[in-house]
Amino acid sequence: MDTTFVITPMGMLTITDTLYDDLDISIMDFIGPYIIGNIKTVQIDVRDIKYSDMQKCYFS
């Protein structure tokens, strides 16, 4: 399984191929060593979020 690490101001996000597809991440451009991308976000019911799903996961 391939894994990509994304560094955000609040921490590091580990993205697997499955998560990459689930989040509908698209790469927009490359600037030096950095990849500029877009993560599709959708509104979900807060009751669907469980603590076990959110371990060490940060978005900014």
Swiss-Prot record:
It holds the Pfam family Chordopox_A35R. InterPro entries: Chordopox_A35R (IPR009247). It comes from the Viruses. Corresponds to the N-terminal region of the vaccinia protein A35. Belongs to the chordopoxvirinae A35 protein family. This is Truncated protein A35 homolog. It comes from Variola virus (isolate Human/India/Ind3/1967) (VARV).
